[in-house]
């Protein structure tokens, strides 16, 4: 399997890397969050830009990103606009979604960009090309807040993401039972055994918490923890998360 190196973080080896979302609505709130995150043992910061009140002004988005980068110069930043259809805060046009991501990928201020799988393939491929030209890694994602698809469907989506050029394919699904969590873990293990790229998977909500902890066993390279406000159901406090991941890593 290929390793994916972003600054001083290597995906695809050792314990899952910890990503903490920033969800501030204003520049002041984001700066406060970034300063707090300086003190936390994390690997990646995700800016959930769909929470930002000035997201439709690209110049203000870039300026806010500059403020975050100044506070966290060595921390990998994942730039994510989560669409409303996949659980995000704001509905926007496809045109705006791609303009935002392509523009910010070209600023030199982000390290990874989230690209949602279920868009026009030509648009997805163009954004991947733009990201890679600017040395930005692509987290290609899909989120199902209603259910856990069949194992074959989860495997198919992750495999398709890799085929399209994702550096880190990602899927998050909602369990209705413990069996659904096992389905996600089984699919993760199946893809991990044959994939060329590290993958990121999780089963959400309380039932799925084990999937956020057991990535090193089943093959998920990153997990999401909450420092201030969880951006998705089931995210664990980042300090508790690090403790459990370290515990499992020592035994593995």
Swiss-Prot record:
<feature type="binding site">
    <location>
        <position position="82"/>
    </location>
    <ligand>
        <name>3-dehydroquinate</name>
    </ligand>
</feature>
<comment type="pathway">
    <text>Metabolic intermediate biosynthesis; chorismate biosynthesis; chorismate from D-erythrose 4-phosphate and phosphoenolpyruvate: step 3/7.</text>
</comment>
<dbReference type="InterPro" id="IPR018508">
    <property type="entry name" value="3-dehydroquinate_DH_AS"/>
</dbReference>
<dbReference type="GO" id="GO:0003855">
    <property type="term" value="F:3-dehydroquinate dehydratase activity"/>
</dbReference>
<protein>
    <recommendedName>
        <fullName>3-dehydroquinate dehydratase</fullName>
        <ecNumber>4.2.1.10</ecNumber>
    </recommendedName>
</protein>
<keyword id="KW-0456">Lyase</keyword>
<dbReference type="InterPro" id="IPR001381">
    <property type="entry name" value="DHquinase_I"/>
</dbReference>
<dbReference type="InterPro" id="IPR013785">
    <property type="entry name" value="Aldolase_TIM"/>
</dbReference>
<comment type="similarity">
    <text>Belongs to the type-I 3-dehydroquinase family.</text>
</comment>
<dbReference type="GO" id="GO:0046279">
    <property type="term" value="P:3,4-dihydroxybenzoate biosynthetic process"/>
</dbReference>
<comment type="subunit">
    <text>Homodimer.</text>
</comment>
<feature type="binding site">
    <location>
        <begin position="46"/>
        <end position="48"/>
    </location>
    <ligand>
        <name>3-dehydroquinate</name>
    </ligand>
</feature>
<feature type="binding site">
    <location>
        <position position="231"/>
    </location>
    <ligand>
        <name>3-dehydroquinate</name>
    </ligand>
</feature>
<feature type="active site" description="Schiff-base intermediate with substrate">
    <location>
        <position position="170"/>
    </location>
</feature>
<dbReference type="GO" id="GO:0009073">
    <property type="term" value="P:aromatic amino acid family biosynthetic process"/>
</dbReference>
<dbReference type="InterPro" id="IPR050146">
    <property type="entry name" value="Type-I_3-dehydroquinase"/>
</dbReference>
<dbReference type="GO" id="GO:0008652">
    <property type="term" value="P:amino acid biosynthetic process"/>
</dbReference>
<feature type="active site" description="Proton donor/acceptor">
    <location>
        <position position="143"/>
    </location>
</feature>
<comment type="function">
    <text>Involved in the third step of the chorismate pathway, which leads to the biosynthesis of aromatic amino acids. Catalyzes the cis-dehydration of 3-dehydroquinate (DHQ) and introduces the first double bond of the aromatic ring to yield 3-dehydroshikimate.</text>
</comment>
<dbReference type="GO" id="GO:0009423">
    <property type="term" value="P:chorismate biosynthetic process"/>
</dbReference>
<dbReference type="Pfam" id="PF01487">
    <property type="entry name" value="DHquinase_I"/>
</dbReference>
<keyword id="KW-0028">Amino-acid biosynthesis</keyword>
<keyword id="KW-0057">Aromatic amino acid biosynthesis</keyword>
<keyword id="KW-0704">Schiff base</keyword>
<feature type="binding site">
    <location>
        <position position="212"/>
    </location>
    <ligand>
        <name>3-dehydroquinate</name>
    </ligand>
</feature>
<feature type="binding site">
    <location>
        <position position="235"/>
    </location>
    <ligand>
        <name>3-dehydroquinate</name>
    </ligand>
</feature>
């Amino acid at each position: 399997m290929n390793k994916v190196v972003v600054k001083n973080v290597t995906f695809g080896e050792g314990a899952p890397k910890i990503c903490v979302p920033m969800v501030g609505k204003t520049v002041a709130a984001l700066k406060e969050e970034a300063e707090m995150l300086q003190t936390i043992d994390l690997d990646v910061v995700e800016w959930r830009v769909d929470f930002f009140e000035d997201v439709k002004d690209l110049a203000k988005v870039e300026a806010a990103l500059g403020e975050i980068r100044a506070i966290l110069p060595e921390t990998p930043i994942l730039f994510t606009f989560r669409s409303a259809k996949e659980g995000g805060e704001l509905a926007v046009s496809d045109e705006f979604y791609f303009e935002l991501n392509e523009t910010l990928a070209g600023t030199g201020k982000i390290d990874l960009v989230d690209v949602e799988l279920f868009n026009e393939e030509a648009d997805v491929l163009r954004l991947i090309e733009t990201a890679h030209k600017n040395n930005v890694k692509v987290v290609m994602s899909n989120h199902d807040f209603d259910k856990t698809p069949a194992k074959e469907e989860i495997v198919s989506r992750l495999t398709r993401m890799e085929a399209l050029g994702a550096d880190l394919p990602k899927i998050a699904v909602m369990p209705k039972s413990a069996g659904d969590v096992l389905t996600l873990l089984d699919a993760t293990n199946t893809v991990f055994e044959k994939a060329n790229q590290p993958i990121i998977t999780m089963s959400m909500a309380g039932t799925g918490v084990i999937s956020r902890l057991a990535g090193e066993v089943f093959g998920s390279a990153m997990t999401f923890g909450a420092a201030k406000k969880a951006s998705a159901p089931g995210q664990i406090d980042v300090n508790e998360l690090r403790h459990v991941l370290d515990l499992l890593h020592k035994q593995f």
